[in-house]
Amino acid sequence: MAMTLPYLIQAKQQGRPLVALTAWDYAIAQLLDGAGVDIILVGDSLAMVALGHRTTLPITLDEMIHHAKAVCRGVKQSLVVCDLPFLSYQESISQAIRSAGRVLKETGAQGVKLEGGHAVAVETVQQLTSIGIPVMGHVGLTPQSVHRLGYRQQGQTEIDAERIISEAIALENAGVFALVLEHIPINLAATITSKLSIPTIGIGAGPHCDGQVLVTADLLGLSKKQPPFAKSYLNLRGLITEAVNEFSREVREGEFP
């Protein structure tokens, strides 16, 4: 059965943890979908893991759509959500509607994700959801704000924690169907999760969220450098290097084909 938004709410109500991972191409998406991942995120992190940029900022909406199309072709069951990249929605509400509309119409994704919980972001969410565009929110560490906030943990002071709680509540009231909590203290994530009726998806936010997401390149051990809160379940980088070295040796020594 294909994943739906009501299932996510039901999962929270019934205490079933949600599994989310990122994908950037057809092959990875097909594998994640076949493994029963609930949510596949076409994250703007692909700017770094697939395109070699140092931050997520350079990736364009056209590039995100290109990758999301490939991901959606590989998915039969999982819910696909695509990030709106930097400066594809911040300029105006009309720009956000055009960008989100393009993603849904051109890719087949079921929703979009945007960062931040400030007043402009909340208004944007309200407008998008009012015309039927499903939106996932994202608070805490927001990579599109890297030059202002850096990659450090957010919500460490009482003032910052209260701000993030207020943002989370405002985003739920604006209509987001789920909320990513990135790199915030465990107790803060637990508080937010208990206050919301929508599911929270944690990344570096502890065990008390309604689900967890990782960048798949980190999970597979493909990344040269990964965040301290990520976990590698495989050293795929080493396995690929080993396989390529063995192939090269066999070719050069006349053993293959």
Swiss-Prot record:
Residues bound to Mg(2+): 44, 83, 115
Recorded metabolic or biological pathway in which this protein acts: Cofactor biosynthesis; (R)-pantothenate biosynthesis; (R)-pantoate from 3-methyl-2-oxobutanoate: step 1/2
Cofactor: Mg(2+)
GO biological process, one term: pantothenate biosynthetic process
Location of the active site: 182 (proton acceptor)
Gene Ontology MF, one: magnesium ion binding
Cellular localisation: Cytoplasm
Main subcellular location of this protein, as a coarse class: cytoplasm
Catalytic activity: 3-methyl-2-oxobutanoate + (6R)-5,10-methylene-5,6,7,8-tetrahydrofolate + H2O = 2-dehydropantoate + (6S)-5,6,7,8-tetrahydrofolate
Entry note: cofactor: Binds 1 Mg(2+) ion per subunit.
Protein EC: 2.1.2.11
CDD domains: KPHMT-like
Coiled-coil residue windows: none
Keywords: Cytoplasm, Magnesium, Metal-binding, Pantothenate biosynthesis, Transferase
A cellular-component GO term for this protein: cytoplasm
Entry superkingdom: Bacteria
Keyword Transmembrane helix belongs to the record: no
Positions bound to 3-methyl-2-oxobutanoate: 44-45, 83, 113
Family: Belongs to the PanB family.
Function of the protein: Catalyzes the reversible reaction in which hydroxymethyl group from 5,10-methylenetetrahydrofolate is transferred onto alpha-ketoisovalerate to form ketopantoate.
Quaternary structure, from the entry: Homodecamer; pentamer of dimers.
The name this protein goes by in its record: 3-methyl-2-oxobutanoate hydroxymethyltransferase
Gene (name only): panB
